[in-house]
């Protein structure tokens, strides 16, 4: 087994997030729409107040995340974000700050992505991104180390066929609110035998062959990795899941320290890491489409675009 070389790579992301279900951004409320119609000086004053109230700060997540890099790019690309800063910490800290702001109906701008339970729990919206810094709709890809097809043809076939919908991932995350991810994944597999049968059709069982799946510490990826784990284990594999920073994920697969990953967000979020190691791994294509990243605000905030934010004084 290509067991991950922890000490040599030296970065471990052992976060335990509570992402349970995803959704898309909500439409503006009637009050928000009416306020926006006023336009003029009132709108300018409102956005200026919002920007100063949050001290020209975007509440971000982990420094190594792709969305963190994209937000840094936005701070450069948008002239009106001159003087703004991104405050990085952790996904859990961002979610706490978002919840506190909403409880007090205060302004906040966070880095967000979907699928994510925050859109189901709160009334949120993505800010429009006229410059396209955050890209459009994303997909999640499957990558494997070179030689996996020859070494583990059965696992390769299953991973190559693995494809599901955002609603499938959402159902696992929702179940994982009350039970652990492996049990939630087993529940999904039990309820979706036709889909699993398509992945495993004609695949011969193995006898305890070890395989390591590398993932990022988002619960979206914990969902896909655990479902793949259950399916591979049913075929006789001994599966290890290794959560790491995104850059390490690509390095692990490129260098053969991990066997496969169902976690890369493309074409924007993990583009830099993908390009750094391109050609050193095999890309099996999309396993989920319809993902998105961007700047997110509560719907009660009277702004709709990144360009509505005011430069720092």
Task: Describe the residue ranges of each PLM region.
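Bacterial signal peptide processing site
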Residues: 25-28
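Short helix-initiation/N-cap motifs at beta->coil->alpha
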Residues: 85-97, 218-219, 240-252
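Periplasmic-binding protein-like
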Residues: 119-160, 286-294
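Short, well-ordered beta-strand elements
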Residues: 45-48, 52-60, 159, 207-220, ...
């Amino acid at each position: 087994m290509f067991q991950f070389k922890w000490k040599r790579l030296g970065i471990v992301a052992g976060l335990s997030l509570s992402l349970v279900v995803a959704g898309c951004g909500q439409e503006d409320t009637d009050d928000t729409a009416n306020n926006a119609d006023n336009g003029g000086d009132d709108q300018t004053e409102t956005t200026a107040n919002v920007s100063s109230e949050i001290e020209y700060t975007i509440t971000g997540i982990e420094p190594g995340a792709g969305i963190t890099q994209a937000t840094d790019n936005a701070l450069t690309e948008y002239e009106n974000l001159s003087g703004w800063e991104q405050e990085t910490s952790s996904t859990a800290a961002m979610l706490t700050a978002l919840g506190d702001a909403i409880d007090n109906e205060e302004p906040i701008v966070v880095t967000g992505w979907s699928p994510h339970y925050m859109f189901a729990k709160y009334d949120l919206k993505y800010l429009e991104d006229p410059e396209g810094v955050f890209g459009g709709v994303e997909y999640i890809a499957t990558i494997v180390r070179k030689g996996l097809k020859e070494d583990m043809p059965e696992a390769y076939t299953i991973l190559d066929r693995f494809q599901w919908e955002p609603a499938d991932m959402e159902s696992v995350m929702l179940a994982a609110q009350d039970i652990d991810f492996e049990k939630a994944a087993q529940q999904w597999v039990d309820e979706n035998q036709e889909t699993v049968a398509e992945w495993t059709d004609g695949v011969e069982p193995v006898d305890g062959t070890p395989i390591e799946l590398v993932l990022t510490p988002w619960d979206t990826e914990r969902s896909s990795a655990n479902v793949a784990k259950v399916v591979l284990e049913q075929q006789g594999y001994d599966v290890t899941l290794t959560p790491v920073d995104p850059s390490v994920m690509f390095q692990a697969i490129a260098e053969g320290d991990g066997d496969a990953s169902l976690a890369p967000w493309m074409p924007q979020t993990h583009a830099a890491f993908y390009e750094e190691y391109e050609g050193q791994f095999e890309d099996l294509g999309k396993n989920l489409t319809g993902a998105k990243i961007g700047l997110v605000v509560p719907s009660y905030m009277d702004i709709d675009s990144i360009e509505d934010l005011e430069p720092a004084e």
